[in-house]
Amino acid sequence: MSYRLKLTITISLLIAISFGIGGTLMITTSFNATLKQETQSALSSFESVQNMLYLLNSLGDQSDYESLADALSQMETQGLGRWQALTLKNSEEELFRSGSAELLNYSLPVPAPDQCSYLPVADDQGHGLIVRSLISAGETDLQLQARFDVSHIYEIRAAQQKQYFIVYIAVVFF
């Protein structure tokens, strides 16, 4: 093999490797930024629900949980709730549930009152974000837990990786 051919092949492979590393970093960076943005959006939506429940609880009788459940039901009916599943419980009973209870079968650390904890999950239902908080309601605490669907981000990443792989193969072989 001539020196010129070896040099051409070596430079082509270096370009392909650089292209591969650069593209992978670009997809990963884009995915992480989108996931962070979607997490912030889900947390913001959760905080809106939480603040609405605080407001209703402070305006009415703190033991009247039916008004809280009605408000959540109205939000769901009007399409204002972005959640995939949501529960509101006190220590004795479940006050409101939307969606499948299986979607919320994850143990999260119990947050301090007026704060929330969250956990990204992946299961048969796709990828999601579980968020949990405690709401002070008089002498008892209400537990609000929701799951938000983030599967579409992972689907976009898989499609980008597939397209990139095809382009990468084309660069390597041509």
Task: Give the ranges of each region predicted by the language model.
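Hydrophobic beta-strand residues in large extracellular and virion-surface proteins
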Residues: 86-88, 130, 142-146, 153
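Selective detector of the "anchor" transmembrane alpha-helix that sits immediately C-terminal
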Residues: 166-174
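Extracellular/periplasmic ligand-sensing ectodomains of membrane signal-transduction proteins
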Residues: 82-110
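Helix-start (N-cap) segments at beta->loop->alpha junctions
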Residues: 146-166
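Membrane-proximal, non-catalytic sensory/regulatory domains of signal-transducing membrane proteins
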Residues: 100-144
